[in-house]
């Protein structure tokens, strides 16, 4: 029996390709059944609120479900901020009873790009203002070196998402740049002009150094990385 969050199917997609039409319907219902009291990886194996999963699913909601579904994202954003550790680390899944491990790149994905995507889809500035103090503490936990690059932090789980050949050093720089730029937008939105200016300047300097040190002429790579070129790094670097 299919169960999901208290919302309705609202988005639609149709084309002359039956396979794509079927994929849309399956994707829409897959999203729905991964939403109950929180977003989840999947209802069969993993029902915890991993923030990396939320970062993807919350955007899908805008195109496929009724606006009431955005309340689940609002709940997640506030919980994520409320469970911040005393050392400024933000971690997931939360709420939790026996887990406090940080996956830095998942956290950056949500606190920067995720929060701003939520605002762009809802106009809910109150939630941005609510989570901003936690975001500020987390952003400033990262140490920026004199050349503008951010000092690499593996966290408790050094994971670059699924797949092999993860250029973690390069990926970290790209994610922190993305986070800074979206954090600056949040700061500007709620009147934190000094933070917005700082984050914008820091992102600009990071990007300049990143291009000079990591671009090989054909791809972004850290000089100590020996594996195949990481497509994740290229993607995040481009969107940042």
Predicted regions and their residues:
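Catalytic cores of carbohydrate-active enzymes
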Residues: 28-30, 43-56, 60-62, 71, ...
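Substrate-binding groove/exosite segments of carbohydrate-active enzymes
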Residues: 1-143, 154, 158
């Amino acid at each position: 029996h299919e169960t999901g969050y208290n919302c309705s199917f609202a988005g639609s997609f149709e084309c002359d390709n039956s396979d794509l039409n079927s994929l849309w319907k399956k994707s829409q219902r897959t999203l729905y059944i991964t939403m109950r009291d929180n977003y989840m990886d999947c209802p069969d194996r993993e029902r915890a609120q991993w923030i990396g999963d939320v970062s993807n699913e919350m955007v899908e909601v805008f195109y496929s479900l009724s606006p009431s579904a955005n309340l689940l994202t609002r709940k997640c954003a506030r919980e994520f901020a409320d469970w911040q550790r005393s050392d400024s680390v933000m971690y997931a899944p939360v709420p939790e009873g026996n887990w406090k491990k940080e996956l830095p790149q998942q956290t950056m994905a949500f606190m920067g790009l995720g929060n701003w995507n939520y605002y762009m889809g809802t106009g809910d500035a109150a939630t941005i203002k609510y989570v901003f103090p936690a975001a500020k503490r987390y952003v400033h936990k990262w140490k920026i070196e004199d050349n503008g690059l951010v000092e690499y932090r593996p966290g408790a789980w050094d994971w670059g998402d699924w797949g092999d050949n993860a250029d973690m050093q390069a990926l970290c720089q790209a994610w922190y740049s993305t986070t800074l730029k979206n954090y600056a937008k949040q700061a500007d939105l709620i009147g934190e002009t000094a933070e917005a200016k700082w984050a914008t300047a820091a992102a600009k300097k990071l990007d300049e150094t990143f291009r000079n040190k990591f671009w090989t002429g054909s791809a972004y790579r850290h000089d100590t990385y020996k594996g195949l070129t990481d497509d994740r790094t290229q993607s995040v670097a481009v969107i940042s």
